[in-house]
């Protein structure tokens, strides 16, 4: 049996990391650094939900029309020509993500992606518990809601987007509530996940903690 350290540092080995956590906890930044460090393909699973939200908007489908959204989720195709990162799309994505039929349809896409990619880090809310329960390393990132709101605020400002900190905090708290209370794959760490609170840590400090964990892990 190949140990975790060998899988991580030997690029000829298959190696999968699941990276879960709430909105604006730092997953994206951390995931990209880890992907570069360990030669992994990085994929943000929320993109499939944001793409579906965008498709609903562009095709004028009301998100309360559940049957129509479910049908659309069966035909999902990722299109990189549009900005899927704005808050409106994110909020719609959060609403439709609570619907179990939609999650099941989109998870099929994600599960196949994990299975067909030898070295991957996939970021999301339920990767370690649902999409890739057999991942070699499961990481759960969390942080204080106020800290997360401030991070998102700075990110949006850096992109030149108008935003209000209190509104971002309100939306983060609302998303947390939806994620934790949904019946289909609620947000929670896998039982064997490495849990890291990033409230007082930089992205590089988190990467260092993950790297040390890999080096010292005894399988």
From Swiss-Prot:
Biological process terms in GO annotation: pyrimidine nucleotide metabolic process
EC number: 2.7.4.25
Residues annotated for ATP binding in this entry: 21-29
A GO CC term attached to the entry: cytoplasm
Domain of life: Bacteria
UniProt subcellular location: Cytoplasm
Group of enzyme by EC: transferase
Pfam families named in the record: Cytidylate_kin (PF02224)
Catalytic activity: CMP + ATP = CDP + ADP; dCMP + ATP = dCDP + ADP
GO molecular function per UniProt: ATP binding; CMP kinase activity; dCMP kinase activity
NCBIfam families recorded: cmk (TIGR00017)
Protein name: Cytidylate kinase
Organism of origin: Rickettsia africae (strain ESF-5)
